[in-house]
């Protein structure tokens, strides 16, 4: 038995953070253990550095930036693993899908080792931000052309996500409707899959959550190859 990892993805400013926090609060009100992790995370050195680059406060090469984001995601593997062991619903506001979509927009291939594949992904679909910033206030990647390229990359990436692990929601829908859809589906995913012991890594290895020792916390020892993990076959994942 373990918790689940839920990703909320999409281009900039389509309501991801709003929906992620609303989901966390709604789950807590229903007595579920829930936590929301934002990427980039401003409370970490790496996340703060990434945000400074995105806000054009400091400069960094595109390759360095994308590799730094992937490193940033991998920094949370131990924390996410512990939360799953403790039966939390872990909500990530952006995750590896963003890393891939944004890196591909710059023609860069990134390393994805030591990163989980989300159990379920909500993709808020929109080619452009719902509220455009003035040009002088735009972050890196927030030009219309760049966001459209990133959206195209997202659609390609989402096509490779198993359909029983993905919900595509038009970002222009009423916020209450989006929230209800995300909350209802998240609860169903959690309740129907609480018997799972493993979570898939991006390199198709598995972390045995039940074997994780919260005393010494050497999660690397719990990584296993893909050897007949029938209980975690994508076709058997229930929604």
UniProtKB/Swiss-Prot annotation:
> Quick one: which residues bind ATP?
10-17
The Swiss-Prot or TrEMBL record describes its family as follows:
Belongs to the thymidylate kinase family.
SUPFAM superfamilies associated with the record? P-loop containing nucleoside triphosphate hydrolases (SSF52540)
What is the native source organism of this protein? African swine fever virus (isolate Tick/South Africa/Pretoriuskop Pr4/1996) (ASFV)
Q: Which PANTHER family match?
A: THYMIDYLATE KINASE (PTHR10344), UMP-CMP KINASE 2, MITOCHONDRIAL (PTHR10344:SF4)
**By its UniProt entry, which Pfam families does this protein fall under?**
Thymidylate_kin
Lineage of the native species? Viruses, Varidnaviria, Bamfordvirae, Nucleocytoviricota, Pokkesviricetes
Q: Which UniProt keywords apply?
A: ATP-binding, Kinase, Nucleotide biosynthesis, Nucleotide-binding, Transferase
List each coiled-coil range.
none
Q: Which pathway does it take part in?
A: Pyrimidine metabolism; dTTP biosynthesis
- What is the E.C. number? 2.7.4.9
A Gene Ontology biological process term: dUDP biosynthetic process
Source organism's superkingdom?
A: Viruses
Q: Which GO terms describe its molecular function?
A: ATP binding; dTMP kinase activity
InterPro entries cross-referenced by the UniProt entry:
P-loop_NTPase (IPR027417), Thymidylate_kin-like_dom (IPR039430)
Name of protein: Thymidylate kinase
* PROSITE patterns for this protein: THYMIDYLATE_KINASE (PS01331)
**What's the stated role of this polypeptide?**
Catalyzes the conversion of dTMP to dTDP.
Q: Which gene encodes it?
A: TMK
Which reactions appear under catalytic activity for this entry?
dTMP + ATP = dTDP + ADP
């Amino acid at each position: 038995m373990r918790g689940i990892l839920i990703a909320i993805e999409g281009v900039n400013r389509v309501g991801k953070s709003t929906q992620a926090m609303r989901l966390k609060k709604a789950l807590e009100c229903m007595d579920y253990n829930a936590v929301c992790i934002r990427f980039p995370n401003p409370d970490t050195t790496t996340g703060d550095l990434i945000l400074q680059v995105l806000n054009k406060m400091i400069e960094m090469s595109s390759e360095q930036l994308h590799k730094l984001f992937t490193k940033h995601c991998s920094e949370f593997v131990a924390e996410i693993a512990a939360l799953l062991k403790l039966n939390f619903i872990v909500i990530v506001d952006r995750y590896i899908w963003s890393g891939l979509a944004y890196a591909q927009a710059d023609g860069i291939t990134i390393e994805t080792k030591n990163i989980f594949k989300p159990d379920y992904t909500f993709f808020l679909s929109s080619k452009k931000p719902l509220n455009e910033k003035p040009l002088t206030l735009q972050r890196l990647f927030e030009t219309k052309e760049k966001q459209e390229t990133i959206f195209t990359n997202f659609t390609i990436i989402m096509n490779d996500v198993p359909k029983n692990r993905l919900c595509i929601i038009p970002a222009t829908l009423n916020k209450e409707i989006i929230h209800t859809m995300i909350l209802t589906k998240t609860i169903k995913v959690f309740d129907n899959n609480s018997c799972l012991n493993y979570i898939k890594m991006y390199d198709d290895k598995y972390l045995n959550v039940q074997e994780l020792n919260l005393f010494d916390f050497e999660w690397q020892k719990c990584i296993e190859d893909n050897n007949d993990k029938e209980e975690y076959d994508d076709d058997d994942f229930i929604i």
